[in-house]
Amino acid sequence: IWIKLNAKGLKIRQLDRRWAAEMVNDFRDNLLKFLRLNSDEPFQSAEFLNSGSYFEKVKIRSADEFDMMLKLRVSPRLMTEALDNGLFYHIRLARMPLPVNPIRAFVLDEHMLSSSKILSEMYCLVRNDFLWVVNRKRPRSPAVTLSLYRKDTCGDELISVDLVPALEVQSWPVGVRSGPDVDNWLGKKFRQEIRSLPIFYVPKRLKGQTESWRISFSHIEKTLIRKHGNKKTCCESNITKCCRKLCYMLLKSLIEGLKLRFPKELDPLCSYHGKTVFLHTMSTRFDDAMWTPQQLTACFRDLFRAMESHARRGLLPHFFVPECNLFSPAVFPPKALAFLVSVLEEQWREGLPLLKLPAPVPPIRAMSPSEDTSPEVSTDVSATLTTFLPLFALALVFVLFLKFGLRV
């Protein structure tokens, strides 16, 4: 029961969702206007692509963080060189662009396109406006984080926006060209539709590299999570509702709680590990009948056990790049992974305490300073009154009789 109650509390209120959407849309319009007025390319002709948990409708608790991609126009003739198992790349232009081509400013030796230069240029560009505040750069992050405040005050931050410059490329690299394994889940036709979509490269730095790009499938992940049903009618009405998204939101909440409780020990852990486990689980447990709302508790337990199993085996293949292990020692240190396994086992053993709602606190009754809270004193006073009240009443009647009766 408490898992269902917790899941209800994770949903963002419709009023808050509408308010946040209006604010972010206003920000997006202002940023586009700002970029169009600048002569710096390729940002002047950039376009937005919404991504992240809010637009997947799995954001939990509050609509205070948004992710957006800023699509940059580049030459379609690009050459990619895989740096690891197909997640990170060097990108080179087939030939050196002409001096009039604005992308030339970001090209290094051997026609290599610089991820660090594009990210730095974007930082410099967005600092020139007063409608938002640019946050400090985070190590190896592909995003420029902006904070939005009320126009009439410099008080608390209202919304944080991660703005990620991204190169849109139509051709998929060889290692991922077959697409994700969704045949049993969403069908072969849907898989072909996915394969026809472009992919994106974001300026994410691989450890030991300075000019690397990471391949991003966030726009396709959004499609998979929104069109999650084995049948097209899934979640179209209350009759065909499923509990997939609620299970994912519960897992996000658990990961968030673990990160807050053990920030140092679980530093490598992030929400994307949870998303990857969720995508794999939806692909294997594809039948809609396995995800009915009545089975929420059991379904979440299965999802949790899948997360625990991946951690214990030290194997979590990227959903789109299966050769890339998100739990490999190179990206997730063995000590941190062992700690993750232990805390997941502890959570399971103790009944998932991080997801339990806090016990209600009894209301506090206001009391006067002179009020005695001792039960013994209260009992004595009551007994005394019970004994002497009849005698006092009889004495009062006798006095009145003497006073008025004698006069008569």
Model-derived features with residue positions:
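N-terminal regions immediately upstream of nucleotidyltransferase
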Residues: 1-64, 70-124, 128, 401-406
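Terminal (often C-terminal) interaction modules
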Residues: 1-11, 26, 30-38, 43, ...
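Helix N-terminus capping/helix-initiation residues
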Residues: 13, 114, 198, 332-333
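Acidic carboxylate-rich catalytic motifs and surrounding loops in phosphoryl-/glycosyl-chemistry enzymes
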Residues: 46-49, 134-144, 318-324
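Short, solvent-exposed polar/charged micro-motifs at secondary-structure junctions
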Residues: 55-61, 172-175, 329-332
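Catalytic cores of NTP-dependent nucleotidyl/adenyl transfer enzymes across multiple folds
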Residues: 59, 94-309, 390, 399-401
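Polar/charged alpha-helical tracts
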Residues: 77-80, 120, 124, 188, ...
